[in-house]
From Swiss-Prot:
It comes from Enterococcus faecalis. The keyword Plastid does not apply. It comes from the Bacteria. This is Antitoxin epsilon 1. In the presence of the zeta toxin, forms an inactive PezA(2)PezT(2) heterotetramer. The lineage of its organism: Bacteria, Bacillati, Bacillota, Bacilli, Lactobacillales.
Length: 90
């Protein structure tokens, strides 16, 4: 599978966004001293889901799939902001 400039650029954007989202949730979990083994906690489940999603080998994906993955991370970015902000307000 050929790697093009556009594909490499898309992968770099996804990597930056996914790291930002994952780190936001991880920092929340650590700062609130949540038990990472307690799968009944929404934040812990979200952290685990994001960790699994980061393990995808992006270089093995076709460009169209990269676009879908990018949209997934955009959605998780919005979702994590909403969830973590609601927790701060409550």
């Amino acid at each position: 599978m050929a790697v093009t400039y556009e594909k490499t650029f898309e992968i770099e954007i996804i990597n930056e966004l996914s790291a930002s989202v994952y780190n936001r949730v991880l920092n929340y979990v650590l700062n609130h001293e949540l038990d990472t083994k307690n799968t009944r906690l929404l934040e812990v489940n979200l952290l685990n889901q994001l960790e699994v999603a980061q393990e995808v080998d992006l270089f093995q994906q076709p460009f169209e799939e990269l676009q879908a993955i990018h949209e997934y991370w955009r959605s998780m970015n919005q979702y994590s902001k909403q969830i973590l902000n609601k927790e701060k307000v409550a």
